[in-house]
Design a protein with these regions (language model features):
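Short, low-order "capping/linker" segments at domain edges
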Residues: 87-102
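Short, surface-exposed ligand-recognition loops at beta-strand->loop->(often short) alpha-helix junctions
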Residues: 9-21
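Amphipathic alpha-helical interaction segments
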Residues: 16, 35, 50-51, 81, ...
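An amphipathic, aromatic/His-enriched active-site/gating alpha helix that lines ligand/cofactor pockets
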Residues: 28-37, 54-89
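Short, well-ordered beta-strand segments in beta-rich or mixed alpha/beta enzyme
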Residues: 2-9, 39-69, 102
Length: 102
């Protein structure tokens, strides 16, 4: 099952409480999408957090729901996304490699 990882750093003028609330709203919007098993955020320091979302196959590659997109922009107003990755489990990685090499 793929995992989406993103790291967010608070903008200088942003309120930490508002940033946490925006991250929670994004997680809730993600969990409401079909195929998403879990979405949570974790503080990694006083000014940064990480979001982890576990979802089925193509859900993470598809456009987000309108609610998830709005929540993503709301978080973006308060924090800068400094990195984002999608992690594949070993079987998915091997499947992708096999398709690429026919």
């Amino acid at each position: 099952m793929p995992v989406s990882y993103s790291r967010w750093d608070r903008r200088d003028a942003a309120d930490r409480n508002a940033m946490g609330a925006a991250a929670l709203d994004l997680c809730r919007a993600m969990r409401a999408m079909d195929g998403v098993d879990d979405s949570r955020f974790y503080w990694t320091g006083t000014d940064s957090l990480v979001l982890l979302t576990h979802a089925d196959g193509g859900v993470l590659a598809a456009p987000p729901s309108p609610q998830a997109a709005a929540a993503n922009f709301a978080l973006g107003d308060l924090a800068r996304q400094t990195s984002a990755e999608t992690w594949l489990d070993p079987s998915q990685g091997m499947e992708m490699y096999s398709r690429a090499n026919g």
